[in-house]
Swiss-Prot record:
Its main location: cytoplasm. InterPro entries: PyrdxlP-dep_Trfase, PyrdxlP-dep_Trfase_major, PyrdxlP-dep_Trfase_small, Ser_HO-MeTrfase, Ser_HO-MeTrfase-like, Ser_HO-MeTrfase_PLP_BS, SHMT-like_dom. The modification N6-(pyridoxal phosphate)lysine is found at K228. GO terms for molecular function: glycine hydroxymethyltransferase activity; pyridoxal phosphate binding. Its cofactor is pyridoxal 5'-phosphate. One of its GO terms (biological process) is glycine biosynthetic process from serine. Pathway: One-carbon metabolism; tetrahydrofolate interconversion; Amino-acid biosynthesis; glycine biosynthesis; glycine from L-serine: step 1/1. This is Serine hydroxymethyltransferase.
Amino acid sequence: MSYETVREADPAVADALEGERGRQNDTLAMIASENHVSEAVMEAQSSELTNKYAEGYPGERYYGGCEYADDVEELAIDRAKELWGADHVNVQPHSGSQANMGVYLGVLEPGDKILSLDLTHGGHLSHGHPANFAGQVYEVEQYKVDEETGYVDYEGLHDHAEEFEPDIIVSGYSAYPREVDFERIQEAADAVDAYHLADIAHITGLVAAGVHESPVGVADFVTGSTHKTIRAGRGGIIMCDEEYADDIDAAVFPGSQGGPLMHNVAGKAVGFGEALAPEFEQYAQQTVDNAIALGEQFKEHGLSLVSGGTDNHLVLIDLRPSHPDTTGKEVEEALEEAGIVLNANTVPGETRSAFNPSGIRAGTPALTTRGFDEDACREVADLIYKVVDAPHDDDVVAEVSDRVDEMTDEYTLYE
């Protein structure tokens, strides 16, 4: 994209925009929740729809002049239904967290009970952490992964549900490298007459492509964000059975949002259309294959992976067994200096602060978008290990940085 007009109007902002484009082009994005959208999605998100207020839903707006807003939203809805096989879809949430809020407001009362995965075990803030709205409005208890295996303790979850009697059980996670057994979680919900919300923010694209089990038709509600593995730009989405449609729509608007961001809805429509193409399934499978290769190479270097590997787009490394004196934050900062951007992350049984934890999380969605295959990801694992093993060695960091420069030149991104 050209920023010539921005530069004429505001050189300082143009400098930041061009700097960010250069940063993305010249570094390897391995934060598991990040990806690179197409130029078409970015064009849609910077369209004249940014000017349009469209409170309400297609055919039922509170303002005039919404015919094209209706067209775009209906395209996004229809394409989402085709991608995920959902009965009802709301594409207006501004984010995945807003989508979760829409479900909570739609079917819960303040003080109702939520059972969700502990944040340090791979859950998400919006699933009921005390710092988040969900933890402040609802009564929340959290289930765990088995610290020995790294897998969700489904039996423990079932027992916890029977004891706590939640109104809703949340599945779907932000740092869990294994396939989620939505059927088993639904069984736990059925046993206590609870709703089941499956938050697939991280795996929307994997589910759409059929390379991960789908919760659609299993869970009562499915939420997600649209900028991770689905590559449809920033935003959220809610899917549900038709019986819940009115409650969910009312909880989004007017319950928790005003006018939708129609330029972002346009980006969703374009991204969903791209995901309906046959090559998207190949992309999703390659993303998983790349993560598996990345994890296997880490293990060759003696690093400890939570759960021993991955079934999806991310790997979670516990540094304590191999590098007990090194924190995830040290590694994150050294890798960023070398041009590899991932994040420090808590791990099951965490003993350090969440701001300086014992693990690192690495994802392959953005690398795969650039064209990386398994061999390239194995080399990236080698580079990461060099920095893990010597995060304060300037020569090592410089050596890795030089190789990253070569790789970003080979696997180009935005012109």
